[in-house]
Amino acid sequence: MKINKNSAAAKVPFIKPNVNVMYQIDFKRDDSKPKDPETNIHKYGCNFMCCLAVPQFMNKKKLRSSQIIDIYLYAVKSGWIEYDCTVIKPNEVMNYTAQVLGDKKYRYANVFVKGIASDLDWNVSNYQHTSDLPGNGNIYFFIVDFLTGSSGNYGGHHFELYNSIGTLMYDPANCTVHKYKGVNKISCYKVFLKK
């Protein structure tokens, strides 16, 4: 996912991976416990872990595994994610994570989700002319949903975090997923300063 280096999108600030955040494979897996938080984070937690990574990078603070499990349990109870880590309300997950980290400066929000299968001509540079997108020093990032073609550990999908110029910032599987069948969708997020 690359954009023109001279575009407006290339000139916005972007998140830097400045802390060593945990990977989903750092959590122990026990297939005999289908609703075990660690097992579900290990097997299916890539999108969930991407949502947790952004506030950690913005605040330069790393969550402990116990905090991640607490966030998982709270998010399930609140209806923001399902037990299998399917993220339903990413804004709430990110903003609650920021709260756990003591973040009083930033707010995180989804700007748009673009299904690639529904618009094969779309590419990342298309967003640079949208009024709400890059410019004015705003920080943007993408969570990309890749199709893996298997229903194994990652349920046929794998999610990775990219900055606004298309550079991979975080792979929650720590590069253990190697074969992609294409992109399913791209979710664009914006970091706002709280007022």
Feature annotation, model-predicted:
Residues 1-84:
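Active-site-adjacent structural segments surrounding the nucleophilic cysteine of cysteine proteases
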